[in-house]
Amino acid sequence: MDHPLPAGRLSPPWKLFADHLRLTVRLTPNGGRDAFDGIDTDSEGETYLGARVTAVPEKGKANKALIALVSKSVGVAKSSVSVISGETARKKILRIEGDPEDLARKLEVFLE
């Protein structure tokens, strides 16, 4: 259920499932501001959405800030966003509960 993209554009860093979307994020904690840096690829060619938060990576503070940033950006409750992989790593996979097509549309702004 991934969205096809025109030639030359990066593939989206998310996958759609029946009741949620999984988003790959590379987080920069202590990043000076809470914001997204756009989509990029890692050394293995996997795409991710870059994000930075002002919170430090202690006791889950940066993860909580990331969840708040993502939930606000796609218009869901914080409780609808969870880290399912990479709890202590910079690269994380987030599960966002909701209509996956609607969530993907809201994230497509980062593909432009």
From Swiss-Prot:
SUPFAM superfamilies: YggU-like (SSF69786). It comes from the Bacteria. Gene3D superfamilies: YggU-like. Pfam families: DUF167 (PF02594). InterPro entries: DUF167, YggU-like_sf. Disulfide bonds: none annotated. SMART domains: DUF167 (SM01152). Belongs to the UPF0235 family. This is UPF0235 protein RHE_CH03912. It comes from Rhizobium etli (strain ATCC 51251 / DSM 11541 / JCM 21823 / NBRC 15573 / CFN 42). The lineage of its organism: Bacteria, Pseudomonadati, Pseudomonadota, Alphaproteobacteria, Hyphomicrobiales.
